Amino acid sequence: MKISKRMKLAVIAFLIVFFLLLLRLAEIQLFFTESFSKKKINLIQESVKQRTEEVLISDGRGSFLDRNGRALTGQSEPAVVLFPFLLTQDWPIKKVADILGMSEDDLRQTLGQAKKPVILQQKKIKTLSKQSITKINSLKYPGIYGVYMENEDKPSLASHTIGSTNQDPALLRKKYPDKESLPITTEIGTTGLERTFDEFLLPEQDTKLLYHVDGKGNPLFGMDVKYTAEANTFYPLQIKTTIDQSIQKAMEEVLDEQGLKKGGAVLLDIENSSVLGIVSKPDADVSRQNTLQNYMLTPIYPGSVFKTVIAAAAIENNMVKPSQTFNCNLNLYGEPGDDKGTLSFDESFAQSCNYTFTSLAEQLMKKDSSVIEDMSEKLALTDRAGWEGKLYHETDFRQLYNEKSGVIWGDEKDKSVKKAIAQTAIGQKNVKVTPLEVANMMATIARGGEKRQVKIAEQIEYKNGTTLVTFKDQKLKGETIDKYTSQQLQKILRRVVESPSGTGRRFQDLPYTVAGKSGTAQTGKLSKEKETLYEKWFAGYFPADKPKYALVVLHMDTPGDKALTNSVFYDIVKKVHEIEINQK
């Protein structure tokens, strides 16, 4: 009996499909088991994951330390891990409950509701301590473990500056094509120092507890739980920052207590322009993009803080006579509109008289149209302040992520327009500088004119504390102000606080003597209540006689009479003094 042609075709088609399926199966199980599809999926790892329950204790990523070696991120705290299979065993529930300070019923209920291992931390068990962990582990019962885990719910200090991490498989493979061993779930730095130092922070191996389960979640191989950990004494690496944990924490507490919603504060060590504390508001929330901007690295209208530049240029060009006075009943355009009376140069600076500095700026610009930006550069306001240099294969490595540089003029034509010059002289028009640059300007003046790069990372260390890389102190390039100019600036900055009518007179009773300059910049915005909103600054240094700290506080988008700038500056100086006293 002959087989019909149609039957033959059907058999051939079946064999072709069968062969293709067989080929696909071989591709999956034999040829591309560790790098399947365009996504390079490791099928062996994924199949193991399907039948494995795990508790991640540490992802193995490098961490950040403060200047004294205290943890800023990756802080571990006691935790007790209980596996669900305990409910099927005659386990020492009474002993565990006693150690944790819980009732047996609560503990049984907590475990009974869980489909995955239960993690009990200090958030739930307030009395959990190192002693608790020791007692738990002394039970030596499978499925009950005392460990030290990273608390992801605990907010890290300096969150905007330290930055954040996220999973991005495409970016991971693009940035690190030679690191194929990294799982696609590996988190990489997306903002802040986490991003700039990402290459040094990538994990070698995570630390976890794991056990194999069947389809119903029951243990496959008895109650055997495996502990996997990084045995390398050198990795993960640690970034030792210049931040002082005590100062950083105090600054964040002050801004929270005062209720400053937008803006921030930055404190520098004047000796080498290293960051001791830096806070940006609102608090960083990775789910809300508009909270992630670090305002301390963002150019903002400086208002009258910029008069420091005009004062420096006037002093350097010998335009101010000791007996010279200014009519401060005039506004910035030289028209009637103010009521400060006749003031000397020093008192004009102390009381922030607009007319004095707009008239000086006009005279300066007639002599040299580049004088304002040149002096801004001498005072470290127009180049990004952060540390830059060579780091292995990177010739222009920058420590600070997404740091912007200041801008003075928006249009060259403005240099010949009287009103534009006047607005520029008082830190408006197109003038925008970062709070970090302003803090560095104050540090530069306090040091006698020496410009330095602002450093936030001191060194990269191995896990055992030995040094891999040290970031040396570096000077900023370009011209600087001379000793005489810096001394005269120090004098008038001190006058701002000493003068009975000075804009910084509130700081007269602080435990440190303060020198500085206030600033109020118009934003062109209104609040919901139709109130005019301003950027309110105070920038200065202390102690004035032996400068050690440079501090800038900025309250953004605030009604003038509700600004918290001075209150925050006052409280931070007090906190720094308390910390210094306690450290002695």
Curated annotation (Swiss-Prot):
Traits of the deletion mutant: No visible phenotype. Spores have normal morphology, heat-resistance, cortex structure, and germination and outgrowth properties.
Subcellular location(s) per record: Cell membrane
UniProt cross-references to SUPFAM superfamilies, sorted A to Z: beta-lactamase/transpeptidase-like, Penicillin binding protein dimerisation domain
One Pfam short name: Transpeptidase
GO biological process: cell division; cell wall organization; peptidoglycan biosynthetic process; proteolysis; sporulation resulting in formation of a cellular spore
Side of membrane Cytoplasmic, spans: 1-11
GO CC annotation: plasma membrane
Record EC number: 3.4.16.4
Function: Penicillin-binding protein with an unknown catalytic activity. Penicillin-binding proteins (PBPs) function in the late steps of murein biosynthesis. Beta-lactams inactivate the PBPs by acylating an essential serine residue in the active site of these proteins, thereby interrupting normal cell wall synthesis.
Family of this protein: Belongs to the transpeptidase family.
Entry protein name: Penicillin-binding protein 4B
Record organism: Bacillus subtilis (strain 168)
Gene: pbpI
